[in-house]
Amino acid sequence: MSFAVVLAAAGRSSRFGETKLKKPFLDLAGQPVWLRALTPFLSQPDVSQILISVSPDEVDWFISTFANPVEEHSIQVIPGGAERFDSVQNALNAVSPNIEYIAVHDAARPLLTAEVVEQVFDAARIHGAAIPAHRVVNTLKRVVDGQIVETVPREDLWNAQTPQTFRRDILLAAYAARNEFPATDEAQLVERWGHPVHVVECPSTNLKITTQADFALAEHLLASS
């Protein structure tokens, strides 16, 4: 069964703060964040296509700056769109017709492991749709105007991660039915389309770098691993 990997790297990194580079392109312990996010897929024999979406004005810069890994891994660099879903859609349009499964992964999740990739791929083969996630452990409060209005039961709540992996026809149909629906990930689109999404329990260390504190934590976890 053939898999395509889509790395989403076209975001604005607005919550990360002032840096010369966007967070996927920063050096993290000797490697760019996006390449660390990709590496666990490279050991999967069924991965036959790799695409990364970047901002249109960064396409040439990306290909030039990261020429060695782009060439070595035959990475297709796709111009992104105005929003994340537009960027992923552009990449989906470029997926080879012989691909059976598509994995969408945040380029800012550099601590993904090959073990998690393998587990999610296996679940997608069985269920058609699968994501990694970890259980919510903190107490959650619903707050309105600075006041707690509800303590939210957390027993059935999970933090969704990526790579979110789907049978090709399922993901494409879910995207086709989006109609500007404000989903926050691919799994929500697939749920809305009507196909159940299987959850693979994975460690919380598969974090997404959103702030500089997240980056510092990723550095610490890599140094201590």
Regions found by a protein language model. Give the residues of each.
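Conserved core of the sugar-phosphate nucleotidyltransferase
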Residues: 111-200
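Short, high-confidence coil segments that cap the C-terminus of an alpha-helix
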Residues: 47, 99, 125-129, 195, ...
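N-terminal glycine-rich phosphate-binding loop and ensuing alpha1 helix
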Residues: 1-59
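Structural beta-sheet core signal
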Residues: 5-7, 52, 104, 129-132
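Conserved N-terminal catalytic core of the sugar/cofactor nucleotidyltransferase
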Residues: 34-99
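Hydrophobic helical membrane-anchoring modules
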Residues: 206-225
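Residue-level signal for inorganic ion chemistry
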Residues: 7, 34, 91, 105-106, ...
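Short beta-strand-to-loop acidic/aromatic patch adjacent to the donor-nucleotide binding site
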Residues: 98-109
